[in-house]
Amino acid sequence: MASQGQRVSWGDESTKRRGRSNSRGRKNNDIPLSFFNPVTLKQGSKFWDLCPRDFVPLKIGNKDQQIGYWNRQIRYRMVKGQRKDLPERWFFYYLGTGPHADAKFKQKLDGVVWVAKEGAMTKPTTLGTRGTNNESKALKFDVKVPSEFQLEVNQSRDNSRSRSQSRSQSRTRAQSRGRQQSNNKKDDSVEQAVLAALKKLGVDTEKQQQRARSKSKERSNSKTRDTTPKNENKHTWKRTAGKGDVTKFYGARSSSANFGDSDLVANGNSAKHYPQLAECVPSVSSILFGSHWTAKEDGDQIEVTFTHKYHLPKDDPKTGQFLQQINAYARPSEVAKEQRLRKARSKSAERVEQEVVPDALTENYTDVFDDTQVEIIDEVTN
């Protein structure tokens, strides 16, 4: 095999399944960690007979590195001194990594099954193995997984950790309650002793408490601080929208002031989505240093114009809310639509009433009809 590696081609591969050699693999306690969760094999099945030859997990490495091997983990449990075998686990490692990092592709090793994607390079990868502090990844494949294979998940470790944390938290809460009850008893006795000492000194604690409550009540009854923006003596471009209608500061919506629907204009910064909309507006420094500015005389004033372009993320929900406010004044509101619909329905009902044939000209037919037969009489006599 060339030192630079060759492309994998399964075209000349025999259809006969790969078997095991008699050489022994390394013991489990020496095995580096795989990037992926293991495959558990049903008892009685043989992994090397069932494993597709391109059974390489997705998501790691480039197309040249989709090559490696599945390494067997033999498992058992001791029950009353007797060994009870458990289903085998198989872990995937990339070529040049793991317990058989020095092995060549297709080298016969006990408990090893080689796999590769068509066109992968038969030279060692540099992908390494998983660190001890990292979680293993879920297995995903672009080929059919044999029904005898069970792709394991990390539930057992998470559940074990959760149960351990729950037990620890329960013990902590119980200890905390015990300490708190003990501390409360001590605090009560200390408080009583202090009150008795103050009373002997002539200090009336009840009157002091009443005065404190009275001051607190006075503060609560005092007027709340007015947070309404002071806009009277400010230029239009320095005014701040408060709660309520903003047209008195910025005028009605038009082609030159085209932002805001009826709710936003009527309620100002108390509108439902105002905080989200404000997050989509550039900062002062962004406008100052990231805009194109022009100025010209306009009578006794200077007219200043700036153009600012920026981008909002398309998949952000706030962006959708922001875009709905642009030119909203030119679109009919939902309230106006509903009013027009009600008005149209009312007019339609009036027309129907006007078109009803007078009772004197209709045939008085009182037969009872079933659900499938209806006779309509629409004959008017002169």
Swiss-Prot record:
Keyword Disulfide bond: no
CDD domains assigned to the protein according to its UniProt record, in alphabetical order: CoV_N-CTD (cd21595), CoV_N-NTD (cd21554)
Comp. bias regions, Basic and acidic residues: 201-235
Ranges where the record places region RNA-binding: 33-159
Ranges where the CoV N CTD domain occurs: 224-337
Sequence ranges of Low complexity compositional bias: 162-182
Protein origin, superkingdom: Viruses
Keywords (A to Z) from UniProt: ADP-ribosylation, Host Golgi apparatus, Phosphoprotein, Ribonucleoprotein, RNA-binding, Transcription, Transcription regulation, Viral nucleoprotein, Virion
Chain residue ranges for the region called Disordered: 1-29, 151-240
Coiled-coil region(s): none
CoV N NTD domain ranges (all copies): 31-153
Subcellular location: Virion; Host endoplasmic reticulum-Golgi intermediate compartment; Host Golgi apparatus
GO molecular function: RNA binding
GO cellular component, one term: host cell endoplasmic reticulum-Golgi intermediate compartment
Modification after translation: ADP-ribosylated. The ADP-ribosylation is retained in the virion during infection. Phosphorylated on serine and threonine residues.
A Pfam entry, by short name: CoV_nucleocap
Keyword match Phosphoprotein: yes
Biased composition (Basic residues): 17-26
SUPFAM superfamilies: Coronavirus RNA-binding domain (SSF110304), Nucleocapsid protein dimerization domain (SSF103068)
Family matches, as InterPro entries: N_prot_C_CoV (IPR044344), N_prot_N_CoV (IPR044345), NCAP_aCoV (IPR042548), Nucleocap_CoV (IPR001218), Nucleocapsid_C (IPR037179), Nucleocapsid_N (IPR037195)
Residues the record lists as Phosphoserine modifications: S9, S156, S254, S256
Subunit structure: Homooligomer. Both monomeric and oligomeric forms interact with RNA. Interacts with protein M. Interacts with NSP3; this interaction serves to tether the genome to the newly translated replicase-transcriptase complex at a very early stage of infection.
Family, as annotated: Belongs to the alphacoronavirus nucleocapsid protein family.
Its job: Packages the positive strand viral genome RNA into a helical ribonucleocapsid (RNP) and plays a fundamental role during virion assembly through its interactions with the viral genome and membrane protein M. Plays an important role in enhancing the efficiency of subgenomic viral RNA transcription as well as viral replication.
Protein name stated in the entry: Nucleoprotein
Species of origin: Canine coronavirus (strain BGF10)
Gene this protein is translated from: N
